[in-house]
Amino acid sequence: MGFLIALLVLSILIFFHELGHFVAARFFGVRVEVFSIGFGKRLYTKTINDTQWSISAIPLGGYVRMKGQDDSDPTKVSYDSDSYTVKTPWQKIIILLAGPFANFLMAFILYFAISQLGVPRLEPIIGDVSKDSPAYQARLQKDDKIISINNHSIKYWYQIGKSINDSPYDIIRFEIARENSLLIKDIKPKIVNEKNIFGESIDRKIIGISAQYKPTSQTYGFIDGFEYAFDETLKASTMIFKSIQKMISGDVGADKIGGIITIVDVTAKASQSGLLALFFFTALISVNLGVLNLLPIPALDGGHIMFNLYELITGKKASDDVMYYLTMFGWVLLLGLMALGIFNDINRILH
């Protein structure tokens, strides 16, 4: 069941991406010849308003084929008025951006839905105090509940670390609820050097406490939900861009690249963990698709945007030979990355 849900999620994300291209193309009067979910043999086809809507055998992607556009050979053109070819560079760029934009919009919608359903949080209750830590020396105890930090109300555990690290003061004031008493504790955090998820050294202020597992949820109002959704979409996009940058620079190894097997497996597990977990992971995949499609690789939207930006800036098109060979290189690179991802997936399964 989880596997089928994973395929359904991927199909929905691909449909949304291609729908973005479709809507923008039709807005500018471009005829869309084919709208396909999946590749390979077409299992189902229905023609509506001159567009063949298809479901194909291999559900690992999808495509919109516009009149006058051929990703496998960009030199194949049509000069009819309803052709992609005759549109101006800025119109083509908008059509190309519409796909990734649709993915970011889908992630935003999912994060907004999460904000209304209730974001999983932990209550600000101490589960453990590290020996000889600043919290230990201040005599904080297990089951203490942190009410405020520097007179700012604390409702959830995640706010504690942020408040400590954002504080401009050397000494931080904690208001603690213990049994039926309210206590004030002034604590000087210690600074530790740690590695983040990208292997970078960062300084972090800590007082030496860990959370007690007391789950709760944080529900946002309508306007605050929009802000939460925007922030989460932006954070996910930034993280993925930075991950790609670290892979290119060699700071993150190629063995960390995951393929379709990992995506399906993790999505299936997320679906078994509940609706919120599925929404979180689906939003992350959607942002991932949006970011990856913006990379300046000729086989992707970003590559086509690059060609059109060149034409917009210089006033002339890239030569047919340059476009053809760069596109072929892009496909080889893309297929190579997909193969590497699948290899890493299989390697992880075997080990």
Pin down the residues of each PLM region.
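Membrane-embedded helix-turn/re-entrant segments that form the catalytic/gating core
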Residues: 26-107, 210-211, 217-220, 225, ...
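Functional transmembrane alpha-helices
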Residues: 79-83, 87-90, 194-291, 305-329, ...
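Hydrophobic transmembrane alpha-helical segments that form the core helix bundle
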Residues: 85-128, 231, 290, 299-300
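Alpha-helical transmembrane signal-anchor/signal-peptide segments
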Residues: 28-33, 118-136, 141
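PDZ-domain C-terminal substructure recognizer with occasional recognition of PDZ-binding tails
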Residues: 141, 147-148, 162-203
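Divalent metal-coordination and catalytic microenvironments
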Residues: 17, 55, 99, 293, ...
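Conserved PDZ fold ligand-binding element
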Residues: 135-157, 233, 326
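Active-site His/Glu-centered metal-binding helix of metallohydrolases
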Residues: 19-24, 101, 105, 295, ...
